[in-house]
Design a protein with these regions (language model features):
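Catalytic cores and adjacent flexible loops of soluble metabolic enzymes
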Residues: 1-223
Length: 223
């Protein structure tokens, strides 16, 4: 299929114009990367025959509210599936994926547990918990994911030695099919969902970061 990407980024932050700039009528450039800009790119690719549009956020810069806005905008104006791809580097990843799911996105990209979060994509295991609570059937064989994770853990250990020369901390093992979450952590998933549904961006991010911290994933902007 033709999966076409609308690459997300943000406008530079300019300093407030000084006295003389204002006096001479000079102002900062107008925003370029607006909702209308991204929708226009998506429409162009849909008209060219795209089978799916991916909101591609390689730097993890898109916060929950913005991705929810774009997902709803795309779903309203183009009639092909919408995918969302992001990373967790600045700390938005998991919260933004949750917001995208609640906004009606068709596909979200994830990583398996031992290669997730940090500079990677959100963990499929955490997304699975959210989807189960929301009544969303992902169609993913989580038993197969668990078997893959066993192999990925060994690969990660090898990479730690060959690439980093040290044993980097790994997240607590977690299989959503067999492990029971502590009540306070399970409640954080519910809190994040409620916050995302209420468009409370700060609370959504806070709850998701606490979930990630519990499992030992890197803090924002840490490897």
């Amino acid at each position: 299929i033709a999966d076409c990407a609308v690459c997300y980024t943000v406008d530079p932050k300019y300093p407030e114009p000084g006295f003389w700039a204002k006096l001479t009528g000079k102002s900062n450039p107008k925003p370029v990367f607006t909702d209308a800009y991204f929708l226009d790119k998506a429409r162009q690719m849909a008209e060219l025959g795209a089978d799916m549009i991916t909101i591609k956020d390689m730097s993890g810069l898109i916060p929950p509210r913005r991705v929810a806005t774009l997902v709803k905008l795309f779903k309203k104006n183009i009639d092909i599936p919408v995918d969302f791809h992001t990373h967790c580097t600045p700390g938005y990843g998991l919260a933004s994926v949750l917001a995208a799911i609640i906004a009606g996105v068709d596909v979200v990209d994830t990583n398996c547990w031992y290669f997730a979060e940090g500079t990677g994509a959100p963990a499929i295991e955490l997304v699975h918990v959210f989807c189960k609570k929301l009544g969303v059937d992902t169609g993913v064989n989580m038993e197969a994911v668990a078997k893959i994770n066993t192999q990925l853990r060994e690969i990660r250990k090898e990479l730690n030695q060959s690439v980093f020369g040290t044993e980097k901390p790994e997240p607590k093992p977690f299989n959503p099919l067999t492990d029971t979450l502590p009540a306070e952590i399970d409640a954080l998933f519910d809190k994040a969902i409620k916050a995302a549904q209420a468009d409370d961006e700060a609370a959504t991010i806070d709850a998701c970061r606490k979930i990630e911290a519990y499992f030992g994933f890197p803090a924002p902007n840490e490897l």
